[in-house]
Amino acid sequence: MGRIGNIINRKGKQDAQRAKIFTKHARAIAVAAKEGGADPEYNAALKTAIEKAKADNMPNDNIDRAIAKGAGAGAGEDYETIVYEGYGPGGVAVIVETLTDNKNRTAGNVRYYFDKNGGNLGTSGCVSFMFDKKGQILVGLGDGVSEEELMDVALEAGAEDFITEEDGYEIITTPEDFSSVRDELKAKGYEFISADVKMIPQTTTVLTEESHLKMMNKLVDMLEEDDDVQDIYHNWEVE
């Protein structure tokens, strides 16, 4: 299964826990607004956070409240971004990005999830060298989407790579060019399965043992259930 299929499956799982997903998006939006201002046209981090929330069908009222909370004087709790790295079962490399107001709580929880599921939490840098930070835009096989036209628009806008998959198209950019490529595609009327700057694995790991598959699924589920966890990246090749 390609990356697009993985994203579609993940979105299906998230539909069942929509309230929790909205809470995570609201936190990310509020922090982005607090740090860079309430206007997404002048705050790239806020614009990306809003786009991600909308991709998960978060209502505009919820988004507006989160922006207002973050932009208000002395608004909200003090959150910080902390990234954890480690190995899951079968040697799968895992990166966990969190947004927390209590790093001791978050560190303890993340370590527990790894230990509980046949993995181990490592030190900073222990697996990140296996990933590249890239902008990734996924476009589905919608009506009227021409592969050739989409590729031309993406590459002319500054995309690094264009990959055709079974479920759609993957457009890769540098982190610096992500916003301009995304905005150009959106202006041309393309709709996205997802669009974000993320850590993309250089190689993937296939799990063949049933016990490893079960533990890896459980590890991802437990991490996704944690309110402090914003994003999870791994090099597990989901078949």
UniProtKB/Swiss-Prot annotation:
One Pfam family, short name: TACO1_YebC_N
Classification via SUPFAM superfamilies: YebC-like
GO molecular function: DNA binding
Coiled coil: none
One Gene Ontology CC term in the entry: cytosol
Name assigned to this protein: Probable transcriptional regulatory protein CD630_07950
PANTHER family reported in the protein's UniProt record: TRANSCRIPTIONAL REGULATORY PROTEIN YEBC-RELATED, TRANSLATIONAL ACTIVATOR OF CYTOCHROME C OXIDASE 1
Gene3D superfamilies with a match to the protein in the record: 1.10.10.200, 3.30.70.980
Domain of life: Bacteria
